[in-house]
Regions:
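Short catalytic micro-motifs in class I SAM-dependent methyltransferases
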Residues: 92-93
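A short glycine-rich, Lys/Arg-flanked "PGG" loop and its adjoining helix->strand segment in the class I
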Residues: 103-115
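Conserved alpha-helix/loop element of class I SAM-dependent methyltransferases that forms part
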Residues: 2-19, 36
């Protein structure tokens, strides 16, 4: 991914460095952002959620000596709890979902964060409303062509614009949403509870 060598370290630097803080990683994969983060905060307690057993196994192998809890499943389905996490992070994972789906997820995430907790989102976004609509139309056409129902998850990119992503976060209850940086179409957004 273009600029990954820049945005993974940048994202990690946005996470809390307080001792024994608890961080939720949505779509953690093999933990690319955690490589950088554990250098900054070796005592962090991380809960990672991912759909891939193989990626979780690799992450566990890489960080066998860290305080990490891994959950196999969809972050839409796995319970997060309430006021559990100091921060949450997601890198290049949430561009597969509609604004409505994200509002539901972000509402659940908002409840899971402690007071003054925050969410760091690094992902790629559509650069215009037209581009966002093209992605959405292409997905709908593909689903119709292949008989995929709305109940089924289909791994297809439908990135929102930064404006629409920010609106989803605000609608979910976040009080402050700011863009921290960008690399072309990839942005880092911070949303504070």
């Amino acid at each position: 991914i273009e600029s990954a060598n820049e945005f993974y370290p940048f994202t990690a630097k946005q996470l809390p460095t307080t001792e024994n803080c608890h961080v939720l990683d949505l779509g953690c994969g093999t933990g690319l952002e955690l490589q950088e983060y554990y250098l900054l905060n070796p005592s962090a307690m991380v809960t990672g959620i991912d759909l891939s057993q193989g990626m979780l196994a690799e992450l566990k192998r890489k960080f066998a000596n860290k305080d990490i809890t891994l959950m196999l499943g969809s972050y839409f389905d796995v319970p997060f709890g309430e006021e559990v996490f100091d921060a949450a992070v997601s890198v290049e994972s949430l561009h597969h979902f509609t604004k409505g789906e994200k509002i539901k997820l972000y509402s659940k995430l908002h409840k899971a964060l402690k007071d003054k907790g925050y969410f760091i989102l690094t992902d790629y976004f559509s650069l215009s409303d037209d581009e966002e609509q093209v992605h959405r139309r292409n997905l709908l056409a593909l689903k119709a062509e292949q008989g995929i129902t709305d109940d089924e998850f289909y791994h297809y990119d439908i990135p929102l614009t930064v404006k629409h992503e920010s609106e989803a976060l605000v609608e979910a209850g976040f009080s402050s949403v700011v863009v921290l940086n960008n690399w072309g179409a990839t942005y880092t957004i911070k949303a504070v509870k």
